[in-house]
Amino acid sequence: MSFRLSFAPPADDTLAKMRDADSFRAEMARTLGSDPYGHASTAVKSERDRREATVYGAIVLYYVSGSVLTVTVVRLVPLP
């Protein structure tokens, strides 16, 4: 099962400034897009669908909407 990736405006702005945005999107699709509860992600504040993971050198805070198969990235922090 594959999840659609969506980026909220703050995360989308950060993504637009990343050097290798296309590779980052591809890695997001490969990892969190196929298993949003995997890839060593952790629940934030005991909310199962509010998660954090490190993907392709960036910290990603996202929500999982299982009913519509969507992962929404709300914050994206590229590591130096």
Feature-to-residue mapping (PLM):
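Basic, Lys/Arg-enriched alpha-helical interface segments
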Residues: 1-59, 63-80
